[in-house]
Amino acid sequence: MRTLWIVAVLLVGVEGSMYELGKMILLETGKNAATSYIAYGCNCGVGRRGQPLDATDRCCYVHKCCYKKLTGCNPLTDRYSHSLKNKTIVCGENKPCLKEMCECDKALAICLGKNVNTYNKNYKITMKMFCKKPDAC
């Protein structure tokens, strides 16, 4: 299990907003982002795109579309701040792009939490070759 965690960290990275996103996902779903969503479906994980396989995968698809709208920041390297108020994620950035990035991540975490019952262990590691071309965002 420890080896899997190390590999997941290397694949996902802990720099930039990925660390914050992982914390948000854990809060909303109770699941570890690196071990549960690294290669889930056709859209969860870096560099993955395809027709969503279920509601959980659709959350990741919408998140990628949200990231595509960002200008002036990089989700893999830039960091933002957020806090919790009454168990609610609050994005606390003054820079517009970082605030938008935080809002994208917050929306993903909330979506995954609302759809945690659709999580299908059979989609946990989906090969790209089984994913159909996605619709445009």
UniProtKB/Swiss-Prot annotation:
InterPro entries: PLipase_A2, PLipase_A2_Asp_AS, PLipase_A2_dom, PLipase_A2_dom_sf, PLipase_A2_His_AS. Residues 1-16 form the signal peptide. One of its GO terms (biological process) is lipid catabolic process. SUPFAM superfamilies: Phospholipase A2, PLA2. It holds the Pfam family Phospholip_A2_1. The record marks 127, 130 as: Hydrophobic membrane-disruption site (MDiS). GO terms for molecular function: calcium ion binding; calcium-dependent phospholipase A2 activity; phospholipid binding; toxin activity. GO terms for cellular component: extracellular region. Its main location: secreted. SMART domains: PA2c (SM00085). Keywords: Disulfide bond, Myotoxin, Secreted, Signal, Toxin. It is found in: Secreted. PANTHER family: BASIC PHOSPHOLIPASE A2 PA-11-LIKE, PHOSPHOLIPASE A2 FAMILY MEMBER. Homodimer; non-covalently linked. This is Basic phospholipase A2 homolog Bsc-K49.
